Amino acid sequence: MRVFDLPPVITDLVLARNRLRHHYLSASLDFTLDGNLIGDIGEAVAAELFGLQLSPRNGTGIDGHAPDGRTVQVKATGTNRGPAFRMVDTRAQHLLFLEFDLDNLKGEIVFNGPEEVALRFLAPSWVGQRSLTKRQIRQADTMVAENHRLSRIR
């Protein structure tokens, strides 16, 4: 099952964001939950869903390890965009890309497979950051054999 309910603790965060929106309504500010916060939520949720052992922050492109020992990179969005990548010395064996619908407190596993499959859509080398489109990451997921996916534990 690709779609899942976000943990109840996320409700408090979304409600606080909504209160900010209401309070500053005349300023037309979005108070978008994005960046590092969404990335951290993605890692925490992925750890719960797949039994990942998260690694200390080390900037290597590896966020944790799956129960079978595979290294895992977790990417997440709450803004309806595809995943962004940087050039790193060490690539993870596996990639999980999660998309959050915070207004409805739902999440979707968009990509669950070897990271190299997703990276085929990017040039072999680049400077800075490069992103896949939503279409590209979904297409990459169709190329993953079922036995190459991580199994959910929850």
Where are the regions that the model predicts?
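Nucleic-acid endonuclease domains
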Residues: 1-154
